[in-house]
Amino acid sequence: PSMLRTNSYDTICHEHLEFYSLKVVKNLLEGEGLRIIDVQMNDINGGSFAVTACKKGAFYKSNTPIINWLLNQELEMGLDTIKPYEEFAKRTLLHKKNLTDLIKALVADGKKVFGYGASTKGNVLLQYCGFTEKEIPFIAEVNTEKFGSFTPGTNIPIISEKEAKEMKPDYFLVLPWHFKNSIISREEVYMSNGGKFIFPLPEIEII
């Protein structure tokens, strides 16, 4: 459900081949003689949940309120129908257009836009939106093992954050956008000098 709510289409990649609602997990477990006793929400990959289960006959108390709450949320979203997925597809197409229009407009205006963070999910976004070295000449990264490499499919050079900032980009397109708060906290100097960050999801935001 969280992936649909946050428009996190960048989560869909070779590392994440299947996506389950709690109702589907519940049915799978019950088919194997298990039952859900708890479910915990987390922010992993834009929003996930962790399920605790036990054998049906075990005397573990179930966290019924939270389990029923999430099941009702899924029911209200219509996850057992095609509608929310069609709406997700439409929002994804619109987001692609809006983001590509924004980046191309900034570049046409003479602004320098770099990528920030050579993440797996970022590659999904770069490829889907069709960005290349023409729009985004470099990706800034902290992992030294990635320096000198290129983003797959889009062929954008990956360099250190230090090297990227020395070129004084006007904007960074943040690819690991779900780390928004920590990125803003650690980049106060860049922002105080006039630099801006573009967070692409869940909605396009410039800070």
Regions found by a protein language model. Name each.
Residues 46-91:
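Flexible, glycine-/basic-rich loop-and-beta segments that form/coincide
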Residues 144-150, 162-163:
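Conserved nucleotide-cofactor-binding alpha/beta core module
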Residues 91-109:
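A short, well-structured juxtamembrane/interface segment
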Residues 1-18, 22-24:
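Short, glycine-/aromatic-enriched active-site segment of Class I SAM-dependent methyltransferases
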Residues 154-207:
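Phosphate-bearing ligand-interacting subdomains
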Residues 137-142, 198-199:
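Short internal beta-strands
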Residues 34-45:
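Conserved S-adenosyl-L-methionine
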Residues 106-127:
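Glycine-rich adenosine-cofactor-binding loop
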